[in-house]
Amino acid sequence: MQDTNTGSEAAANQEAASSLEEKRDDMKWVVQFNIALNEDAKRYYGFWNSVFKFAVLVFGSYSFASLFVGASMAYSIVAVIVSAISAGQLVFDFKDRQVRAKIQHERYSKALTALDSAKNINELELVQAKIDDIGCDDIDTSDICDALAVNVAIDRMGLDPTRKVDIGCFKRLTRYIIPWARPEYKS
């Protein structure tokens, strides 16, 4: 009878260990994915998005100024001032994006270390709560949903693009991330 109990206990322990590792693996996938996506969105999408906005702004301001150059120089001066202020705002936004990405990267890296150190499900859930708090309000969904950034992140990290991990703020984001990341959507 004791051998049966011992065997059942061993099986339960083995199942608990497997569940722990599976949950740890899922959570690490989420963190690794977001580290890669955060970095590539910053590098590829964020930069070219700012360049495109700036180009449109300059062209629009020039066209606007040209319309009124004959009527009044005041309009041209206003257009130039507005263009300069807007360009400064674009630069500020880009720098702010870089800073936020760096902070998130550091926090996600610490989360990976914490995941490796967790010894049981309860400790993993504590780490999960911290992961859920990392930049959920700061995540720019236009970056997250950008197919180029997602595909680059998936490829560079060698991650399985079909996995869905629904934890915290990523529960609502995976609906956007995963479909765009699947191979059949790649150009």
Which residues does each PLM region occupy?
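Conserved non-transmembrane functional hotspots
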Residues: 2-58, 71-74, 88-187
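Generic alpha-helical secondary structure signal
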Residues: 33, 79-83
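Hydrophobic, membrane-inserted alpha-helices
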Residues: 56-64, 82-86
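Membrane-interfacial hairpin junctions
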Residues: 64-76
